[in-house]
Amino acid sequence: MSSELLEELHWDDGFAIPVANEENKMLEDQLSKLQEERASLQDQLRDYEDRINAMTSHFKNVKQEFSFTQSLCKAREHEIESEEHFKIIAERELGRIKDEIQRLENEMTSIREKKSDKENNIFKTTQKLDGLKCQINWDQQALEAWLEESAHKDSDALTLQKYAQQDDNKIRALTLQLERLTLECNQRRKVLDNELTETLSAQLELDKAAQDFRKIHNERQELIKQWENTIEQMRKRDRDIDNGALALARIKQELREKENLVKEKIKFLESEIGNNTEYEKRISVADRKLLKCRTEYQHHETNRNQLKDELDSLKATVNRSSSDLEALRKNISKIKKDIQEETARLQKIKNHNQSVKKKLKQITEKTMSVEEKATNLEDMLREEEKSVKEVEVQLNIVKDVLFKKVQELQTEAMKEKAVVSEIEGTRSSLKHLNHQLHKLDFETLKQQEIMYSQDFYIQQVERRMSRLKGEINSEEKQALETKIVELKKILEEKKSTFDLLESQIKKLHNDLYFIKKSNSKNCDEKQFLMTKVNELNLFNDRSEKELNKTKALKQDLMIEDNLLKLEVKRTREMLHSKAEEVLSLEKRKQQLHTAMEERMEEIKVHKTMLASQIRYIDQERQNLSAEFHERLSKIDKLKNRYEILTVVMLPPEGEEEKTQAYYVIKAAQEKEELQREGDSLDAKINKAEKEIYALENTLQVLRSCNNNYKQSFQKITPSSDEYELKIQLEEQKRAIDEKYRYKQRQIRELQEDIQSMENTLEVIEHLTNNVKEKLSEKQAYSSQLNRETEEQRPKLERVTKQCAKLTKEIRLLKDTKDETLEEQDIKLREVKHFHKIIDEMLAEVTEENAEIHIILQTYFQQNGLELPTAGTKGSRQSSRSPSQTSLLSARSTTSVASQTSIKVLELNFPASSSVTGNISRPASATTIPSNGKNKKGSK
């Protein structure tokens, strides 16, 4: 057939059969390469998307597990706290009940004793009454006789009457006392009954509360068990994920081993790879450029990370400096306020001092007695002492407040330093982990690129092998021509069988019509079921929304319950703190009382010492005055003696007489000496008197201090103004403390939220940057591929047009409108190539995933087919001979394809597997579908 066609075209025998020229072959090779690169890039993109999804899901699972463990820990802590709290309450309640029982027992014993005493008294009084009644019920006749006998004794009768009245009064008093005691006994019994009923009701309430607590405790235990089960399940899932990762690593290792085997086999094909040296050189140049770009990228990335770290450190320093500046501003404003207050106080003190000075001047100017001056001075001193005390009290208060604030500031500074150090540590660890993650991503990218390059190289080698095996020599051409002659004879024989097959095809068409009818019915049923499924999905969505609403309501109720518990706990803590404060105040009161008593004893001792000193000074003063008088008397005596001596010691005659001036000077000198001694003694006396006066003043000051000290320990009455001021200040303090705690709690919560949000933001920014970079690279690469495909598209259209033109010319030459044998042979080869690609894809997928291998094997066995493997792929390539590519095989396969229908295999994978969809495969490798062009397009 082909020889006749070539003869009609006047084709010379020396030329080969027309095939595609070198340019078209190169274009086809480039197109196939681009398509393969596009497919590999799409697979790589899907792989990246799967990895991102896996990482996000793993991150969500980790987050959820962390939140679950945190909530479980909090629940455990709350449970322990509540159990301890209830234990303390139960112990207190037990102690209180024991005290109450002891008190009631004591009251019962006292009541029993009182009851026995009262019964004894009643018994005695009844005996007395009986005796009195017996005495009264004497014989009236004897009494009248006794009265007649004692009528003359009026005084005795009067006394008897008086005693009788006294006895009546005593009887009435005893009866009244008896009635009163019975009433009191009844009242006590009523009170006892009331107390018993109250205790019983309280006991019942306590039992009910205990039952409720046990119920709540059991519910909490069940909830915690459920949480623990969920956490255990999540851990199991994590273990399964880890096992899957290990299996994936193992499979990758096996893949690497197989790749090594392939490399060893490829060494045998080095003789056929001479044509690839130029491409390899280009690839090496491109690799060098890529390595340079990667090194530059790593350098830029390290610079960027360093700059980012510096920016973070600068931000931290700026934040720290701003916080320090704000703290300094606040301290400066506080110091300014304190300075203003102190200046105002100083101005007040100065004004007060000026007024005191004015008063002092007025007092000094006025002619007052010494006593009035002393009283004024004492009043002034008292006022000054009061003002000084007030200032000292205020100063002590300010000092205490300042000390507390300084301590709080120190603690807050320490906390801030600790938090800053923790933040810096976490940041450094995060940077280190990010750096490691970048390194690992870079290494994985390198390995994937190496794998993709090796796969591409293997595919090229396989294509070349197939081309080498599919080429036809001149000797084979002659053999084929002889076979064509033989096959023509066979064709005539087959035409008879063709008629039979046409009748069978008609029958099959009828069967197909009935099958289509049943298929349309099945489609209607499928649509009905799909509507039902959609309705069920809507119902599920609605129910899930309602479930979420109920969960939100439940969470709100739990939050309210926790808030109420916190409020109760806070009030209890406040109560305990107040009780502790009361105890500390009572201890302080006792300490102050003991200190006051010790101070009083010291003051008494000091008083006795001062009195003894005063007595001693008085004695010294008296001694000095006695010495002074003695010396005056001595002076008089000396004067007399002087006069006597002057008379006696007159100079004898003949000697010079000492003048009077000499003796006057001598006497004046002696007088001056005596005057000096007297002045010194007067100074000592004055000094002693001043010291006594000062000691008296100090004694008065001590007395006033002691009086004020006593008054400070007096209890404040509720009617006084100070009591109301104290209550107001306590309320203000309580409100301020509550506000302070609330603000602190808010600040802590906000800081925690900000920290968590910053961490999540950093992680998300890092992930988004990585994804954006990868996406930009892929987009650039895909745009490049699209440009290349757009450039190749007109060439492809031109080639398809040329092929269509040639097919039309060939059909016109053969005078046929149907497909020729050559076209069928070309389609057969295309289909075989398509089947080969599908087999390779299935083999690769089954090698990568064992689960998919099992599922595919079951589906293929159900449809009576064999699953393609790596071995069958190699055998299929090796078993392909030139004889199978001959026109004889083409004719036989076309005839069989026209008689048989295509067998479709539907694969429905479960949701857990990563592969979903339908895979259609022909019954055998030799079947040719009727729509070959569509197959080619789908490829």
From Swiss-Prot:
Keyword Magnesium attributed: no
Protein keywords: Cell projection, Ciliopathy, Cilium, Coiled coil, Cytoplasm, Cytoskeleton, Phosphoprotein, Primary ciliary dyskinesia
A UniProt-annotated Pfam family: CCDC39
Annotated compartments: Cytoplasm, Cytoskeleton, Cilium axoneme
Biased composition (Low complexity): 875-889
Transmembrane regions: none
Position of the signal peptide: none
Modified residues (Phosphoserine): S898
Biased composition (Basic and acidic residues): 787-796
A Gene Ontology cellular-component term: axoneme
Described function: Required for assembly of dynein regulatory complex (DRC) and inner dynein arm (IDA) complexes, which are responsible for ciliary beat regulation, thereby playing a central role in motility in cilia and flagella. Probably acts together with CCDC40 to form a molecular ruler that determines the 96 nanometer (nm) repeat length and arrangements of components in cilia and flagella. Not required for outer dynein arm complexes assembly.
Entry's family note: Belongs to the CCDC39 family.
Illness the protein is tied to: Defects in CCDC39 are a cause of a primary ciliary dyskinesia (PCD). PCD is characterized by recurrent respiratory infections and situs inversus. A spermogram showed oligoasthenospermia: the midpiece is narrowed in around one-third of sperm cells and the flagellum is shortened in around one-fifth.
Protein's UniProt name: Coiled-coil domain-containing protein 39
